[in-house]
C-alpha cells in the first residue's frame, strides 16, 4: 500500500545540548522550522538560541524531569502546531508511552513505533526474533526463569560462568555475573530484586558470560515503506560497570568479513 510522504513544516526537538543543536541544523538545511524546549536551569544555555522558536518546559520540575514531561511536551507541540517530534537520544527517545501520546495527538514521532520499542526493548523477545531470522545469539535461554531450581539446572547445562540478566534491563543495570554454583542462589535473588525495583518486573533469563568481549553495535535506519539500511558499526567495548564510556567508529579491529556479517545480520533483524 502506498503511503503518501508527509511534509514537515515544524519539528519540535525534545532534547537539549549538542544533539539538539545538530537536529536544529538538519531542520534548517531541509527548510523545516525548529522548536526547542529548555528547563529553567537551561535558560541561558547555547542550544536554546539555535532553534527558530524556543520555549520553557517543566517550570515546576527539576533540570532532568523537565525533559521527561510527556504531557507538557505534547501540549506545547499542539499549541505551536508542530508536525513531528524528534527525541534525540536519551530522555524520551526509547519511551513507548511518549510515542503513543504522539500518535494519539496526530504528531509524528521521528523514530520507531511503540510496538517496535516494546518488541526490541524486551531482551528475551529480541533474542527470539534474532533466532527466527537465523542470526546467532549468545548461548543461553530465550524464556524467563521460573525459579532458582530452574536457574540451577540451566546454569549447569550452559556451564559457568553465566550471567543473570533482566529482560527489561538497560543502562548497565539488571546484570549479575555468577562464577560458581555456590553463589547462584543469592545472585539470582539479588537479580530478581534489582530488576523489580529498577524496571518494575523481575523477569530474568540466563546467558553464558563472555569475559572481555568486543561490544559492537550497528545502527539501522528504516522507513514506513519497508526500506532498511545499516549505517555501519561502532565499537562500544570501553565500559565501566557495563556502561559505555567511549564509542568509536569504525571498529578498526574487526575483520572485514565479520563486519559484513554483523551489518547484514542487523538488517535481517530489522
Identify the residue ranges that each predicted region occupies:
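N-terminal beta-alpha lobe that positions the nucleotide/phosphoryl donor
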Residues: 1-270
Amino acid at each position: 500500500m502506498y503511503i503518501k510522504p508527509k511534509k514537515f513544516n515544524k519539528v519540535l526537538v525534545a532534547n537539549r545540548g549538542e544533539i539538539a543543536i545538530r537536529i536544529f541544523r538538519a531542520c534548517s538545511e531541509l527548510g523545516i522550522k525548529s522548536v526547542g524546549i529548555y528547563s529553567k536551569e537551561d535558560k541561558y544555555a547555547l542550544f536554546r538560541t539555535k532553534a527558530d522558536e524556543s520555549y520553557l518546559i517543566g517550570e515546576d520540575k527539576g533540570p532532568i524531569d523537565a525533559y521527561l514531561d510527556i504531557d507538557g511536551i505534547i501540549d506545547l507541540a499542539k499549541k505551536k502546531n508542530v508536525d513531528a517530534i524528534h527525541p534525540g537520544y536519551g530522555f524520551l527517545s526509547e519511551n513507548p508511552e511518549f510515542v503513543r501520546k504522539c500518535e494519539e495527538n496526530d504528531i509524528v514521532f521521528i523514530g520507531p513505533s511503540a510496538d517496535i520499542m516494546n518488541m526490541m526493548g524486551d531482551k528475551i523477545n529480541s533474542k527470539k526474533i534474532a533466532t527466527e531470522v537465523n542470526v546467532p545469539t549468545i548461548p543461553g535461554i530465550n524464556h524467563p526463569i521460573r525459579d532458582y531450581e530452574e536457574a540451577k539446572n540451566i546454569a549447569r547445562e550452559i556451564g559457568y560462568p553465566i550471567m543473570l540478566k533482566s529482560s527489561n534491563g538497560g543502562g548497565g543495570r539488571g546484570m549479575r555475573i555468577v562464577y560458581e554454583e555456590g553463589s547462584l542462589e543469592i545472585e539470582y535473588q539479588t537479580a530478581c530484586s534489582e530488576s523489580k525495583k529498577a524496571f518494575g518486573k523481575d523477569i530474568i533469563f540466563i546467558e553464558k558470560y563472555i569475559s572481555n568481549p568486543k561490544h559492537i553495535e550497528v545502527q539501522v535506519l528504516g522507513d514506513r515503506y519497508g526500506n532498511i539500511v545499516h549505517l555501519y558499526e561502532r565499537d562500544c567495548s570501553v565500559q565501566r560497570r557495563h556502561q559505555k564510556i567511549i564509542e568509536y567508529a569504525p571498529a578498526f579491529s574487526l575483520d572485514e568479513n565479520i563486519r559484513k556479517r554483523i551489518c547484514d545480520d542487523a538488517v535481517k533483524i530489522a
